[in-house]
From Swiss-Prot:
Family according to the record: Belongs to the mitochondrial carrier (TC 2.A.29) family.
A GO BP annotation: transmembrane transport
MF annotations from Gene Ontology: citrate secondary active transmembrane transporter activity; tricarboxylate secondary active transmembrane transporter activity
Residues of the signal peptide: none
Listed GO CC annotations: mitochondrial inner membrane; mitochondrion
Solcar repeats: 10-97, 109-199, 212-297
Xref: PROSITE patterns: SOLCAR
Protein encoded by which gene: CTP1
Organism for this UniProt entry: Saccharomyces cerevisiae (strain ATCC 204508 / S288c)
Biological role stated in the UniProt entry: Transport of citrate across inner mitochondrial membrane.
One Pfam family, short name: Mito_carr
Protein name: Tricarboxylate transport protein
InterPro entries: Mit_carrier, Mitochondrial_sb/sol_carrier, Mt_carrier_dom_sf, TXTP-like
PANTHER family: SUCCINATE/FUMARATE MITOCHONDRIAL TRANSPORTER-RELATED, TRICARBOXYLATE TRANSPORT PROTEIN, MITOCHONDRIAL
Length: 299
């Protein structure tokens, strides 16, 4: 069994294009889970609304129309496309910088560091502003007097109004929890994927510069998604609260953590874990599979 890896630098443009296509496809397919997760995180503790994500999706679609579960979807797709492109570009670039100069191997620790760097990069460049728009739109849709929905102004004008109202500081409010979440997400997700992929390649004596089969890639990506959800959910909940329309009630990220814990309890940090699990399991499988396939096509 070979213990050596062939160093394979990924072309930056190919990495960005493959990541962007994977991100766009994943966003279109999994958005209802993202919608349900965000709504569950915004539901008041005293509310009698169902906490079952499938029931929430069904009732929302039934009472408000199927389009209601895609509120904020355009912003999410654009953000996810940019995010995934930046993520894989950053990960592959940092990964190649951290490889062992003699063997081309990337240790588990270095894989986590590469994921951490990619997560920080994507959080500032793409995730924070687009997540702020998505969260505000979902929150606004459920309010008694929606400002950015059902006003006859159209999607583009409503999005523009929201961006103007929030301003730069509003779009980047919550950048700390977003950066913490994305850094943790990608450190766990990409680090886990890279490590398991390497173990499989070592076990099967497969070349390190070739992707796994589509089935294995999907399974490894899905498993990485499961690990990511439960280890980073508290950061995701705080991020959502800091980007909601009521975010001004929290003076800082730490104050948000403390307030949720004091007023709603520890379990609240994992509210929305089930739909997020559904999305990230699918997301992990879809993103890594499409990414690997597109890289092969572009090679």
């Amino acid at each position: 069994m070979s213990s050596k890896a062939t160093k394979s630098d990924v072309d930056p443009l190919h990495s960005f294009l493959a990541g962007s296509l994977a991100g766009a496809a994943e966003a279109c397919i999994t958005y209802p889970f993202e919608f349900a997760k965000t709504r569950l995180q915004l539901i008041d503790k005293a509310s009698k609304a169902s906490r079952n994500p499938l029931v929430l999706i069904y009732k929302t679609a039934k009472t408000q129309g199927i389009g209601s579960i895609y509120v904020g979807c355009p912003a999410f797709i654009i953000g996810n496309t940019a995010k995934a492109g930046i993520r894989f570009l950053g990960f592959d670039t940092i990964k190649d910088m951290l490889r062992d100069s003699e063997t081309g191997e990337l240790s588990g620790t270095r894989g986590v560091i590469a994921g951490l760097g990619a997560g920080l990069l994507e959080s500032v460049a793409a995730v924070t502003p687009f997540e702020a728009i998505k969260t505000a739109l979902i929150d606004d849709k459920q309010s008694a007097t929606p400002k950015y929905h059902n006003n006859g102004r159209g999607v583009v004008r409503n999005y523009s109004s929201l961006v103007r109202d929030k301003g730069f500081s509003g779009l980047y409010r919550g950048v700390l929890p977003v950066s913490m979440r994305q850094a943790a997400n990608q450190a766990v997700r990409l680090g886990c994927y890279n490590k398991i992929k390497t173990l499989i390649q070592d076990y099967t004596d497969s070349p390190k510069d070739k992707p796994l089969s589509s089935g294995l890639t999907f399974l490894v990506g899905a498993f990485s998604g499961i690990v990511t959800v439960y280890s980073t959910m508290p950061l995701d909940t705080v991020k959502t609260r800091m980007q909601s329309l009521d975010s001004t009630k929290y003076s800082s990220t730490m104050n948000c953590f403390a307030t949720i814990f004091k007023e709603e309890g520890l379990k609240t940090f994992w509210k929305g874990a089930t739909p997020r699990l559904g999305r990230l399991v699918l997301s992990g499988g879809i993103v890594f599979t499409i990414y690997e396939k597109v890289l092969v096509m572009l090679a």
